[in-house]
């Protein structure tokens, strides 16, 4: 693989000091505890002189306690400034200022397939900072009612992906690490890749999230289901307790056929069809298949944030 030029390597190496490690502790009764665990670790990137850090949301969502550590060995308790459920990113801050530089925000939309980039983490191992290549930019639908249109997929995969910084050749932050995906189809072969959330999804709303803890636009309708897509079928594989889907009587194993009497053909199409109905609180008419019989179920949607443990959020 083509190496980054010496000057760019020096630039990204100096940016290492803007990376921090993040450890979060989540209560046992939090909605996400069973799925994501009660102790989570990841990375964050300092993006403003006031100490503001961006990380992947699932590391700190519902956290009762957050611990942030810089590369120089200093550490501080932290707080969640705000969550952005549309992008899946979160903003946090240390309570006690931690020294270190900031990383400028780049434009993820300028990345192209085959571009060489740098994946950087706060880990102190051989994968702390590695060269990688953009293998694809495409839609990603996550079974937890999550959809982004131009997710960034890179290879080789970094094993420390949660909150990792994706840095372009100018040394600017263009993405935040979210997933490791095995068996990804790219370049006529299957490979392991990391999926990064484009920073462009967060840049326009950073100030309003800092001021309000969230986007100012109304939240999307949320049902509280986990849905898998396989062989053209959309099957509910999990339901959060006491959430709208649970209250409506949906069950794991139900197959979703239609939204508002319109056939659904993919996971991304399912989520768009639900969100197109209006704001959170809107009733969502579903047609499902249960034990070889079609049924109609109406789910009164809600705001996702209303079901989350507030934790350290300011």
Q: What is each PLM-predicted segment?
A:
Residues 14-35, 119:
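A short, Trp-centered hydrophobic/proline-enriched beta-strand micro-motif
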């Amino acid at each position: 693989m083509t190496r980054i030029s010496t000057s760019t390597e020096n630039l990204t190496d100096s940016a290492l000091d803007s990376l921090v490690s993040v450890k979060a502790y989540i209560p046992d009764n939090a909605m996400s505890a069973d799925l994501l665990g009660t102790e989570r670790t990841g990375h964050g990137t300092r993006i403003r002189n006031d100490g503001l850090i961006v990380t992947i949301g699932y590391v700190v969502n519902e956290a009762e306690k957050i611990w942030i550590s810089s590369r120089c060995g200093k550490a501080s308790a932290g707080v969640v400034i705000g969550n952005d459920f549309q992008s899946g990113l979160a903003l946090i801050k240390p309570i006690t200022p931690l020294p270190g530089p900031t990383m400028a925000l780049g434009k993820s939309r300028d990345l192209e397939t085959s571009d060489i980039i740098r994946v950087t983490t706060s880990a102190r191992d051989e994968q702390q900072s590695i060269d990688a290549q953009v293998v694809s930019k495409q839609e990603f639908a996550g079974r937890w009612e999550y959809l982004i249109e131009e997710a960034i997929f890179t290879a080789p995969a970094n094993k420390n992906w949660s909150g990792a910084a994706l840095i372009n050749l100018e040394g600017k932050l263009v993405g935040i690490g979210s997933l490791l995906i095995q068996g990804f189809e790219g370049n006529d072969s299957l490979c392991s890749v990391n999926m990064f959330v484009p920073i462009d999804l967060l840049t326009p709303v950073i100030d309003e999230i800092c001021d309000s803890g969230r986007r100012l636009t109304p939240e999307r309708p949320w049902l509280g289901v986990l849905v898998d897509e396989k062989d053209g079928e959309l099957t509910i594989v999990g339901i959060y307790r006491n959430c709208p889907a649970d209250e409506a009587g949906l069950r794991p194993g139900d197959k979703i056929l239609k939204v508002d009497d319109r056939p659904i053909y993919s996971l991304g199409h399912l989520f768009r069809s639900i969100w197109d109905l209006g704001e959170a609180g809107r009733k969502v008419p579903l047609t499902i298949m249960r034990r070889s019989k079609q049924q109609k179920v109406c789910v009164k949607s809600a705001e996702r944030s209303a079901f989350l443990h507030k934790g350290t959020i300011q």
